Amino acid sequence: MKVAVLGAAGGIGQALALLLKTQLPAGSQLSLYDIAPVTPGVAVDLSHIPTAVEIKGFAGEDPTPALVGADVVLISAGVARKPGMDRSDLFNINAGIVRNLIEKVAVTCPKALVGIITNPVNTTVAIAAEVLKKAGVYDKNRLFGVTTLDVIRSETFIAELKGLNVADVKVNVIGGHSGVTILPLLSQVEGVTFSDEEVASLTKRIQNAGTEVVEAKAGGGSATLSMGQAACRFGMSLVRGLQGEANIVECAYVDGGSEHAEFFAQPVLLGKNGIEKVLPYGEVSAFEANARDSMLDTLKGDIKLGVDFVK
């Protein structure tokens, strides 16, 4: 099993690489790429951790050496949010970065499962899809926008609010990965009831949690460590699916034939081909149905931005 992390010298990339070095199955290869010259050194640093995961780092303009033979590619390359920015402000820089990296993926490892972490995810996944289509290698079951951070935040905040063991909290988060497009389905959380006020405030906190971190770091960064953990959880689920483990389900932003938009975050069953099955997200409350319907213009606009960027 070979996993490549593109953007591995950044805050998310380094955290993700550390977690993968400690969690990937024995005999795996972990390949780190970043434009930054420090990247081979990050790999050397991580190589001193005693796990049976072989690690190599590559720097420079061309990610190709890192991508050869990759089964899973996780892309976190790009600039991070600063106070006053929202995820869409990142578009101007990150769109080109994702396009260039995916062009290399299309040539070097077109069958790899690709997880896009780089924001704005609503748009960068659409960019990736268009690039892969142009190259004639697009497989909708192998491309994912990583929205796991919205899920782990939801689990954490619910557990805190209700005094639960967070390991027992399961919640689907649907829609997209920015602001109003993030929709936690709180009505489905088992064994818990929320007042209308709790639903409204919890939904808002989950939607704005990224901004909470950006402001708390006071210009010193964005949510890198929690995102690293979320990306590792999702990446490990991809790996476990590829290895044939049963019942691996995660929410992800995918081209899953949704009635709502071309790309939509919902639960997917993972397996040897990436997505084995897009799962229904179930019954929703009136509040959730309204929130879902009112986000769709925003979501579709984000997607169109990505499609138009490549065309």
From Swiss-Prot:
Family annotation (InterPro entries): L-lactate/malate_DH, Lactate/malate_DH_C, Lactate/malate_DH_N, Lactate_DH/Glyco_Ohase_4_C, Malate_DH_AS, Malate_DH_type1, Malate_DH_type1_bac, NAD(P)-bd_dom_sf
Subunit comment: Homodimer.
Gene this chain is encoded by: mdh
GO BP annotations, alphabetical order: malate metabolic process; tricarboxylic acid cycle
Reported function: Catalyzes the reversible oxidation of malate to oxaloacetate.
UniProt-annotated binding residues for substrate: R81, R87, N119, R153
Family that this chain belongs to: Belongs to the LDH/MDH superfamily. MDH type 1 family.
Domain of life, source organism: Bacteria
Gene3D superfamilies in alphabetical order: Lactate dehydrogenase/glycoside hydrolase, family 4, C-terminal, NAD(P)-binding Rossmann-like Domain
PANTHER family hit by this protein: MALATE AND LACTATE DEHYDROGENASE, MALATE DEHYDROGENASE, MITOCHONDRIAL
Enzyme class at the top of the EC tree: oxidoreductase
Gene Ontology terms for molecular function: L-malate dehydrogenase (NAD+) activity
Binding-site list for NAD(+): G7, A8, A9, G10, G11, I12, G13, D34, N94, I117, T118, N119, M227
Organism annotation: Shewanella sp. (strain MR-4)
This protein's UniProt keywords: NAD, Oxidoreductase, Tricarboxylic acid cycle
Enzyme Commission code: 1.1.1.37
UniProt-recorded name of the protein: Malate dehydrogenase
